Protein backbone atom coordinates (compact mmCIF):
# COMPACT_ATOMS: atom_id res chain seq x y z
CA UNK A 1 0.00 0.00 0.00
CA UNK A 2 1.44 3.35 -1.09
CA UNK A 3 -0.32 6.55 -0.04
CA UNK A 4 0.28 9.11 -2.79
CA UNK A 5 -2.13 11.85 -1.62
CA UNK A 6 -2.54 12.93 1.96
CA UNK A 7 -2.38 16.73 2.21
CA UNK A 8 -3.19 18.20 -1.20
CA UNK A 9 -5.08 21.46 -1.71
CA UNK A 10 -5.60 23.15 -5.07
CA UNK A 11 -7.48 26.27 -6.20
CA UNK A 12 -8.27 27.33 -9.77
CA UNK A 13 -10.26 30.28 -11.10
CA UNK A 14 -11.62 31.36 -14.48
CA UNK A 15 -8.80 32.95 -16.44
CA UNK A 16 -6.13 30.75 -14.88
CA UNK A 17 -3.97 27.89 -16.05
CA UNK A 18 -2.81 25.92 -13.02
CA UNK A 19 0.12 23.60 -13.73
CA UNK A 20 0.93 20.54 -11.64
CA UNK A 21 4.35 18.92 -11.89
CA UNK A 22 5.71 15.84 -10.18
CA UNK A 23 7.57 12.59 -10.59
CA UNK A 24 6.10 9.62 -12.42
CA UNK A 25 3.73 7.79 -10.08
CA UNK A 26 3.64 10.76 -7.72
CA UNK A 27 -0.14 11.09 -7.68
CA UNK A 28 -0.89 13.70 -10.36
CA UNK A 29 -3.42 11.54 -12.19
CA UNK A 30 -4.93 10.44 -8.87
CA UNK A 31 -5.47 14.09 -7.96
CA UNK A 32 -7.19 14.72 -11.30
CA UNK A 33 -9.46 11.73 -10.74
CA UNK A 34 -10.37 12.93 -7.24
CA UNK A 35 -11.30 16.37 -8.58
CA UNK A 36 -13.39 14.84 -11.36
CA UNK A 37 -15.08 12.34 -9.06
CA UNK A 38 -13.67 9.16 -10.56
CA UNK A 39 -11.75 8.42 -7.37
CA UNK A 40 -13.16 8.85 -3.87
CA UNK A 41 -11.02 9.42 -0.82
CA UNK A 42 -11.99 9.12 2.82
CA UNK A 43 -11.40 12.82 3.41
CA UNK A 44 -11.87 15.09 0.42
CA UNK A 45 -13.60 18.32 -0.55
CA UNK A 46 -14.26 19.49 -4.11
CA UNK A 47 -16.32 22.62 -4.79
CA UNK A 48 -17.26 24.95 -7.66
CA UNK A 49 -18.23 28.52 -6.76
CA UNK A 50 -18.34 27.49 -3.11
CA UNK A 51 -20.84 24.68 -3.74
CA UNK A 52 -19.53 21.29 -2.66
CA UNK A 53 -19.69 18.43 -5.16
CA UNK A 54 -20.88 15.62 -2.93
CA UNK A 55 -21.33 12.88 -5.53
CA UNK A 56 -19.10 11.37 -8.20
CA UNK A 57 -21.15 12.91 -10.99
CA UNK A 58 -19.76 15.97 -12.77
CA UNK A 59 -21.89 17.96 -15.19
CA UNK A 60 -20.18 18.68 -18.53
CA UNK A 61 -21.04 22.35 -18.23
CA UNK A 62 -19.12 22.43 -14.95
CA UNK A 63 -16.09 20.29 -15.71
CA UNK A 64 -14.44 18.32 -18.50
CA UNK A 65 -11.64 15.82 -18.00
CA UNK A 66 -9.01 14.75 -20.52
CA UNK A 67 -7.83 11.29 -19.57
CA UNK A 68 -4.18 10.37 -19.86
CA UNK A 69 -5.08 7.62 -22.32
CA UNK A 70 -7.21 7.85 -25.46
CA UNK A 71 -10.91 7.80 -24.56
CA UNK A 72 -12.80 8.33 -27.84
CA UNK A 73 -14.38 5.30 -29.52
CA UNK A 74 -12.35 4.37 -32.63
CA UNK A 75 -15.44 3.99 -34.82
CA UNK A 76 -16.60 7.59 -34.38
CA UNK A 77 -15.97 10.19 -37.05
CA UNK A 78 -14.18 13.42 -36.19
CA UNK A 79 -17.41 15.39 -36.60
CA UNK A 80 -19.26 13.00 -34.29
CA UNK A 81 -16.61 13.55 -31.62
CA UNK A 82 -16.91 17.32 -31.83
CA UNK A 83 -20.71 17.16 -31.97
CA UNK A 84 -20.69 15.15 -28.73
CA UNK A 85 -18.69 17.93 -27.07
CA UNK A 86 -20.67 20.76 -28.63
CA UNK A 87 -17.68 22.01 -30.62
CA UNK A 88 -17.81 23.14 -34.25
CA UNK A 89 -15.58 21.16 -36.58
CA UNK A 90 -15.01 24.34 -38.58
CA UNK A 91 -13.45 26.03 -35.55
CA UNK A 92 -11.08 23.11 -35.15
CA UNK A 93 -9.95 23.32 -38.78
CA UNK A 94 -9.23 27.04 -38.40
CA UNK A 95 -6.75 26.20 -35.66
CA UNK A 96 -5.48 22.98 -37.24
CA UNK A 97 -5.85 23.34 -41.04
CA UNK A 98 -4.05 20.02 -41.62
CA UNK A 99 -7.32 18.34 -40.64
CA UNK A 100 -9.39 20.00 -43.38
CA UNK A 101 -11.56 17.46 -45.16
CA UNK A 102 -11.44 14.90 -42.33
CA UNK A 103 -14.92 15.49 -40.85
CA UNK A 104 -16.13 12.00 -41.81
CA UNK A 105 -12.85 10.22 -41.18
CA UNK A 106 -12.97 7.63 -38.38
CA UNK A 107 -10.81 8.09 -35.32
CA UNK A 108 -9.14 4.71 -35.85
CA UNK A 109 -7.68 5.99 -39.13
CA UNK A 110 -5.60 8.66 -37.40
CA UNK A 111 -2.20 8.34 -35.79
CA UNK A 112 -1.90 8.40 -31.99
CA UNK A 113 -0.73 12.01 -32.07
CA UNK A 114 -3.55 13.10 -34.37
CA UNK A 115 -6.15 11.45 -32.14
CA UNK A 116 -4.66 13.28 -29.18
CA UNK A 117 -5.02 16.62 -30.94
CA UNK A 118 -8.70 15.93 -31.62
CA UNK A 119 -9.40 14.78 -28.06
CA UNK A 120 -7.61 17.70 -26.40
CA UNK A 121 -9.33 20.23 -28.63
CA UNK A 122 -12.77 18.71 -28.02
CA UNK A 123 -12.30 18.99 -24.25
CA UNK A 124 -10.72 22.44 -24.35
CA UNK A 125 -13.18 24.11 -26.72
CA UNK A 126 -16.31 22.70 -25.08
CA UNK A 127 -18.51 24.93 -22.92
CA UNK A 128 -17.43 24.13 -19.38
CA UNK A 129 -16.29 26.13 -16.38
CA UNK A 130 -13.19 24.02 -15.85
CA UNK A 131 -10.98 21.63 -17.82
CA UNK A 132 -8.64 19.02 -16.36
CA UNK A 133 -5.89 18.05 -18.81
CA UNK A 134 -3.81 14.99 -18.01
CA UNK A 135 -0.80 14.69 -20.35
CA UNK A 136 -2.39 16.68 -23.21
CA UNK A 137 0.82 17.00 -25.24
CA UNK A 138 1.63 13.29 -25.41
CA UNK A 139 2.54 12.07 -28.91
CA UNK A 140 2.08 15.54 -30.46
CA UNK A 141 4.64 17.07 -32.79
CA UNK A 142 6.29 20.27 -31.45
CA UNK A 143 4.41 22.40 -34.00
CA UNK A 144 1.08 21.05 -32.76
CA UNK A 145 2.10 21.43 -29.11
CA UNK A 146 2.80 25.11 -29.74
CA UNK A 147 -0.58 25.59 -31.41
CA UNK A 148 -2.38 23.77 -28.61
CA UNK A 149 -0.69 26.03 -26.09
CA UNK A 150 -2.16 28.98 -27.99
CA UNK A 151 -5.60 27.37 -27.80
CA UNK A 152 -5.17 26.87 -24.05
CA UNK A 153 -4.27 30.55 -23.60
CA UNK A 154 -7.35 31.55 -25.57
CA UNK A 155 -9.73 29.19 -23.82
CA UNK A 156 -8.58 30.18 -20.33
CA UNK A 157 -10.32 33.53 -20.84
CA UNK A 158 -13.64 31.77 -20.28
CA UNK A 159 -12.71 28.89 -17.97
CA UNK A 160 -10.19 27.58 -15.47
CA UNK A 161 -7.68 24.97 -16.66
CA UNK A 162 -5.67 22.49 -14.62
CA UNK A 163 -2.86 20.78 -16.52
CA UNK A 164 -0.18 18.21 -15.87
CA UNK A 165 2.31 16.88 -18.41
CA UNK A 166 5.77 15.34 -18.38
CA UNK A 167 6.80 18.01 -20.88
CA UNK A 168 7.41 20.31 -17.93
CA UNK A 169 8.85 23.17 -19.99
CA UNK A 170 5.52 23.54 -21.79
CA UNK A 171 3.61 23.42 -18.50
CA UNK A 172 5.88 26.10 -17.01
CA UNK A 173 5.46 28.22 -20.14
CA UNK A 174 1.65 28.42 -20.04
CA UNK A 175 0.87 28.23 -16.31
CA UNK A 176 -0.26 31.24 -14.29
CA UNK A 177 0.13 29.24 -11.08
CA UNK A 178 2.59 26.37 -10.76
CA UNK A 179 2.64 23.58 -8.19
CA UNK A 180 4.66 20.44 -7.59
CA UNK A 181 3.14 17.31 -6.08
CA UNK A 182 5.73 15.75 -3.82
CA UNK A 183 5.40 13.19 -1.02
CA UNK A 184 1.61 13.49 -1.12
CA UNK A 185 1.61 17.26 -0.69
CA UNK A 186 1.21 20.13 -3.11
CA UNK A 187 3.80 22.90 -3.00
CA UNK A 188 3.53 26.23 -4.80
CA UNK A 189 6.63 26.98 -6.88
CA UNK A 190 7.85 30.11 -8.64
CA UNK A 191 9.34 28.87 -11.87
CA UNK A 192 12.50 26.96 -12.65
CA UNK A 193 14.53 28.19 -9.69
CA UNK A 194 12.24 26.56 -7.14
CA UNK A 195 12.07 23.38 -9.21
CA UNK A 196 15.87 23.25 -9.23
CA UNK A 197 16.01 23.71 -5.46
CA UNK A 198 13.49 20.90 -5.02
CA UNK A 199 15.55 18.64 -7.27
CA UNK A 200 12.81 18.25 -9.88
CA UNK A 201 14.97 19.60 -12.69
CA UNK A 202 18.68 20.27 -13.12
CA UNK A 203 19.93 23.81 -12.98
CA UNK A 204 21.24 25.63 -16.02
CA UNK A 205 24.80 24.54 -15.18
CA UNK A 206 23.75 20.88 -15.42
CA UNK A 207 24.24 20.21 -11.71
Segments predicted by a language model, with ranges:
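Conserved structural motif at the start of ABC-family nucleotide-binding domains
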Residues: 5-7
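The feature captures the beta-strand-to-loop junction immediately N-terminal to the Walker
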Residues: 21-23
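Helix-to-loop junction immediately C-terminal to a conserved catalytic motif
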Residues: 36
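ABC ATPase NBD coupling module
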Residues: 51-64
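Q-loop/switch helix immediately C-terminal to the Walker
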Residues: 65, 69, 74-90
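Walker B catalytic motif
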Residues: 135-136
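Conserved beta-strand-loop-alpha-helix hinge in the C-terminal portion
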Residues: 185-207
Amino acid sequence: FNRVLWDACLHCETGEVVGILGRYGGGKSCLMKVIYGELRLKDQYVAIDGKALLTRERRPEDMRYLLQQSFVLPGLSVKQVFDDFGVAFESFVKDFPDFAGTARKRMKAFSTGERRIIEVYAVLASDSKFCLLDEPFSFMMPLHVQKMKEVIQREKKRKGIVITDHYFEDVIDISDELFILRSGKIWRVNGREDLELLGYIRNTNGV
